[in-house]
Amino acid sequence: MSGTIATPRALLSLLVAASLVVAGVAQADDAGIGPQDIKRQALSSAVVEMAYSPTQRALFVSAPDWKEEARSRVLRLDPNTLAVKAEIPLKVKGFGVALDDAGNRLYLTQGFNGEVGVVDTATNHALGSIKLLDKVVLEQAYKQAGISGKRLDFLLAELKKFKITEDYQYRIREIKYDSHTGRLFLPGLGFGVDSVLYVVDTRAGKLEKVIPGFGYNAVGITLDEKGRRVFVSNMQGQLITLNADTLEIAATHEVQADQLLNLVYDPASNRLLGVDQGIDRDGYRNHHLGRDYVKRSSGHRVFALDADSGKVLASELTDEVPIGLLLDYRSQRLYVANRKGVRVEHGAGTLTVFDAKTLKRLQTVDLPPHPNSLALDPHGNALFVTVKNDGAGTKAGKPESVVRIQLQDK
């Protein structure tokens, strides 16, 4: 992350977006989702992001292994029962996912290896990876980038603290697939430098371009495929719009949300919906910017922005530390996964449900310890949530889970 040096486990808070082990079913605060609608399945030592394939009628889940990397895999689940139908071995850890369903390809960010993994969803085989970047000597890279003075001293102290000399200068967290061009778009979180956007040509199987100019900690990304726009948010209150065809930055807007971690685009209303995470990262951000950043939001909120201008159309509180969000276009429901704490011993995370048009909160569902990412099966009208361990669950070696929620017709 930009201006931040940390251990791989600490960086996972951004890479997984970047995600239960407690017995029992989730409880709903009001009518809507009830205990009878919820099924939970413990699966692996770690689960991160998911993609539902209508073609395969399967749910694909990234399952990295922190203790033994070669045990990392993609799980293929039955979307009705959550039974594991196939395990697809990976050589390295995979995190964020993007699906090319027509081409039977699943792409995974391999954030600690500088690559994008490729999986054949029809045959359940890994097809290798696409290289994005090499390791560099970070001190040399900082000096070559013109970093000096207090900012350089701060970064070098962080390198010394964590005993880092060589590393990847950018971390890859999220990934989006453009079906019109076959391109992948991947924000690269700058490791002490401004972030970039990686563009991969999947038809050629190679990196096409690296685009600079994405500021401190570029994290959120979504596409307007019909309008040919890519939207990227960062952790300094900016929304950057890229032309999806020319790959030129069309606009950079200052917005009234400091940490838009994840975004979705609503084509029906030309709005961007995003979660403002609310985690304290003032020190790192101020060092990176060389000034005191003035906060614009209380955090822990859901925002609706005009996609053309970045103007706030609506904003409502959600629960603490929102991570993933998903828009059900048919029902106009917005689902938000809230961690309710970072690195806590006992997690009490929730799923909040909003009316997507007004952002009125409709329901809160307990999904402890830490709900993370979301996927939707529109055919079966089912919502899926990955739920990650808290401190106690990790120490006990409990597996992380996927939850299936049967949604009701609106």
Where are these regions (language model features)?
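Bacterial N-terminal signal peptides that target proteins for export
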Residues: S2-L14
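Predominantly soluble domains enriched in secretory-pathway, periplasmic, or organellar proteins
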Residues: I5, V21-K410
